[in-house]
Amino acid sequence: MQLELLNDQGQAASKIDVPETVFDRQYNEDLIHQIVVAYRANARQGTRAQKDREQVRHSTKKPFKQKGTGNARAGMTSSPLWRGGGRIFPNLPEENFTQKINKKMYRAGMASILSQLAREGRLAVVDSLKVETPKTKVLADKFKAMNLQSVMVISDEVDENLYLASRNLKNVFVVEPRYADPVSLVHYKKVLVTKGAIDKLKEMFA
């Protein structure tokens, strides 16, 4: 299989051979959905918390007498039926959101995403991506010349200059192959892969 090799202006300069086991796999929507949901679930910090009726600070005094007022009977204002009362089923920090995905499924899902991106024309190859100075404007101008507004770059090597230049760009995400994740691949409109990263992706997902 061949993919476009882009020049500095974002135009297809030539074609490059890439492994079909990674970039020409059958599209598996169910598997992709499963690994994306699992990745997002496993990234949750699990720190959210709500209070039940025992934890809410309210008086235990009966708000009004049992009979004669015409109101529904009430025992205390911490009841979940009352505004400001506790939750019936509160979210707790100790909830476990972990979802297990075995390695074979994850590799197949990632290869399926990369293959679909290639079919849609959202994935292309560049020789390399380097900047001489850690200046955001330099990298922003480079992507502007290539007509890229939302891009994920999978580079075989992310040096300090490239990291510092890219971290303040809102719609740019630069990573090494080992840090590529399904959510980012699906999110960004364009994915650029350096020539040196292709072999690493093959080792990881073929």
From Swiss-Prot:
One Pfam family hit: Ribosomal_L4
Region listing for Disordered, in residue ranges: 46-77
Gene Ontology cellular component annotations, sorted alphabetically: ribonucleoprotein complex; ribosome
InterPro entries assigned to the protein according to its UniProt record, in alphabetical order: Ribosomal_uL4, Ribosomal_uL4-like, Ribosomal_uL4_dom_sf
SUPFAM superfamilies recorded: Ribosomal protein L4
One example GO MF annotation: structural constituent of ribosome
Protein keywords: Ribonucleoprotein, Ribosomal protein, RNA-binding, rRNA-binding
Source species, domain of life: Bacteria
One of the GO BP terms on file: translation
Transmembrane residue ranges: none
Family statement: Belongs to the universal ribosomal protein uL4 family.
Subunit structure: Part of the 50S ribosomal subunit.
PANTHER family cross-referenced by the UniProt entry: 50S RIBOSOMAL PROTEIN L4, LARGE RIBOSOMAL SUBUNIT PROTEIN UL4M
Function: One of the primary rRNA binding proteins, this protein initially binds near the 5'-end of the 23S rRNA. It is important during the early stages of 50S assembly. It makes multiple contacts with different domains of the 23S rRNA in the assembled 50S subunit and ribosome. Forms part of the polypeptide exit tunnel.
NCBIfam families membership: rplD_bact
Protein name: Large ribosomal subunit protein uL4
Name of the coding gene: rplD
